[in-house]
């Protein structure tokens, strides 16, 4: 157990692992047991619908107190503006609601509602970014962009993902040159 930042731990040759939401998982497990005890009907969590309109109505009203990743005031405000209608909307909000990508949330919301035009800098980006309204939200999208537009191998794309995700400046600088030359060549 440590309070040190990830890079400091890695520089020492140690592995840092974040265990998030374990208390929530325990709460879910206990809730399922209580439902079975009280009602005599076991609930299979993997069979719970991911597209229940009543659940989306709660998200659309920002009634998410106690829901991991969705309970902050800022997130509730954005959910009310977004009016999520599918599971993908919720996944995107969790991915965007962090320093840096957060500035893209208003544009994401406007694009979802047709209030801002979705444009792609290159035709090859359309199938990659279509589900997220032309905004790169996920690491997997960034990897696919490097493969499609710059000719990166899967290993090279993963190196780029790691450089971006861990903010390793020296590796980013190294990858940028490869990315630009690959895009020019393609």
Predicted feature descriptions by range:
Residues 1-186:
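Mg2+-dependent phosphoryl-transfer active-site scaffold
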């Amino acid at each position: 157990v440590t309070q040190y930042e990830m890079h400091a731990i890695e520089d020492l040759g140690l592995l840092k692992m974040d265990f998030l939401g374990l208390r929530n998982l325990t709460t879910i497990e206990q809730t399922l047991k209580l439902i079975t005890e009280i009602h005599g009907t076991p609930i299979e969590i993997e069979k719970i619908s991911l597209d229940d309109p009543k659940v989306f109505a709660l998200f659309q009203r920002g009634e998410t107190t106690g829901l991991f990743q969705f309970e902050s005031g800022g997130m509730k405000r954005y959910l009310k503006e977004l009016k999520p209608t599918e599971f993908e909307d919720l996944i995107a909000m969790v991915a965007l609601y962090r320093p840096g990508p957060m500035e893209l949330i208003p544009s994401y919301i406007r694009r979802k509602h047709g209030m801002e035009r979705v444009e792609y800098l290159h035709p090859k980006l359309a199938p990659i970014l279509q589900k997220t309204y032309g905004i790169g939200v996920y690491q997997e999208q960034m990897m696919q962009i490097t493969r499609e537009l710059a000719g990166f191998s899967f290993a090279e794309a993963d190196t780029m993902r790691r450089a971006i995700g861990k903010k390793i400046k020296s590796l980013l600088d190294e990858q940028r040159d490869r990315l630009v030359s690959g895009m020019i060549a393609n």
